[in-house]
Regions:
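Glycine-rich, acidic loop segments that terminate in or are immediately followed by a histidine
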Residues: 2-106
């Protein structure tokens, strides 16, 4: 199971982390990718549960892929990663790309 969502509110990376980890636990260790549109920058986090990790999904790879699209960078571990970029207008494209990737690994 996966949740990929965008918040219009300017949430911090820490806010997104708390929400993502809580949601990951509620969807039985699935994948949660959250984006936030800030005043000047887009922020994203990915939280990946054990079952999804064993299926080849890695949070760091998700964040790197999306961050490049957003004109920035990021990374982390297999279970949690954080990043962002300055091209907030491309969040929709990043969401589509992540959904397509997650469909391909099901």
């Amino acid at each position: 199971e996966a949740i990929v969502a965008e918040f219009e509110a300017d949430l911090s990376g820490e806010d997104l982390r708390v929400i993502a980890i809580d949601l990951r636990a509620k969807i039985n260790d699935g994948v949660v990718v959250l984006f936030s549109k800030g005043q000047e920058r887009a922020t994203l986090v990915a939280a990946v549960g054990a079952a999804a990790k064993s299926g080849g999904v890695k949070a760091g790879e998700i964040v790197k892929t999306a961050s490049v699209l957003l004109g920035g960078g990021g990374g982390g571990k297999d279970d949690f990663a954080q990043g962002g970029g300055n091209n907030q207008e491309l969040i929709g494209d990043a969401v589509k790309e992540i959904k397509k990737f997650l469909e391909s690994v099901k």
